[in-house]
Regions:
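Hydrophobic anchor at the beta1->P-loop junction of P-loop NTPases
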Residues: 8
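Inter-motif core of Ras-like GTPase G domains
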Residues: 123, 137-160
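Phosphate-binding/switch loop-helix module in NTP-utilizing enzymes
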Residues: 80-136
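Short internal beta-strands
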Residues: 39, 155-158, 183-189
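Conserved glycine(s) of the Walker
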Residues: 15-16
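Short, structured coil segments at secondary-structure junctions
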Residues: 60, 150, 208-210
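N-terminal phosphate/diphosphate-binding loop that engages ATP/GTP or pyrophosphate donors
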Residues: 3, 19-94, 98-102
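C-terminal lobe/tail of nucleotide-utilizing enzymes
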Residues: 172-239
Length: 239
């Protein structure tokens, strides 16, 4: 089976999805896979400077045009649907699906936030609507829906410390309900702390979910050394 890439999602905001995504991209590049990156939506950014998307592109070593790397960029730091509607715009999932389908190399798709974050509104098809309820309305589409459409192995990034057991278990359950392939849960340390739960959380997440769990590694302050350390952490995903 051809290796197509990964769909990276978080269990929460601020868990370090982009860090893990960069590490995976860099590892794929090291293997000579010439990876591509796709951040479908980035919010809280200037339209010409989506920082997370550009960081992914740099790790890939690619020269993707900005509109293929990050087709939707919004200034408001909010969920994609909220940010889009604040600007009177909409996110077209068919455009995103097309970018993945046309990719000629493994692609890493980084979601904006967690699995249930709202991305867009789509009209209900006629067979989804009860005529007694009146004309068709719209349904909210989430990152989980996008993951289901793309059918890429999912890398779920969670915080290393307190609170991660519940977040990871709920996210894994959501993936299982859609029969989506979970490549791994990656527990990431985003700051130095003395949280006593860090040492055992990986074992508990594995026991509770049955998922493959990577990490957490030690926190590394230096950005370059941190990328190298995370690259070693995710090496088993790529080889």
């Amino acid at each position: 089976m051809t290796f197509r890439g990964f769909f990276v999602a978080g269990t929460d905001t601020g868990v370090g999805k982009t860090e893990i995504g960069r590490a995976i991209c860099a590892r794929m590049a090291l293997r000579g896979l010439h990876p591509l990156a796709l951040k479908p939506v980035e919010t809280g950014c200037e339209p010409d400077r989506p920082e997370d998307a550009l960081a992914l592109r740099e790790a890939c070593g690619s020269s993707q045009p900005l509109d293929e790397l990050c087709p939707y960029r919004f200034r408001l730091p909010a969920a994609p649907l909220v940010a889009a509607e604040a600007e009177g715009r909409r996110v077209d999932l068919l455009r995103i699906e097309g970018l993945v389908q046309r990719a000629k190399a493994p692609i890493l798709v980084e979601a904006a936030g967690g699995l249930m974050v709202p991305l867009a509104r789509e009209p209900l098809s006629i067979d989804q609507v009860d005529p007694a309820d009146g004309p068709p309305s719209a349904v909210i589409v989430t990152n989980l829906d996008l993951a289901e459409r793309l059918q890429l192995p999912v890398v779920l990034v969670g915080r290393a410390g307190l609170g991660t057991l519940n977040h990871c278990a709920l996210s894994v359950e959501a993936l299982e309900q859609r029969d989506l392939l979970l490549a791994a849960v990656v527990l990431n340390r985003t700051q130095p702390d003395d949280d006593p739960t860090v040492a055992s959380n990986a074992r508990w997440v594995a026991e509770m979910t049955g998922a493959r769990v990577l990490g957490p590694g030690p926190f590394v302050a230096d950005a370059r050394q941190r990328l190298l350390a995370l690259g070693e952490l995710v090496a088993r995903l790529v080889g």
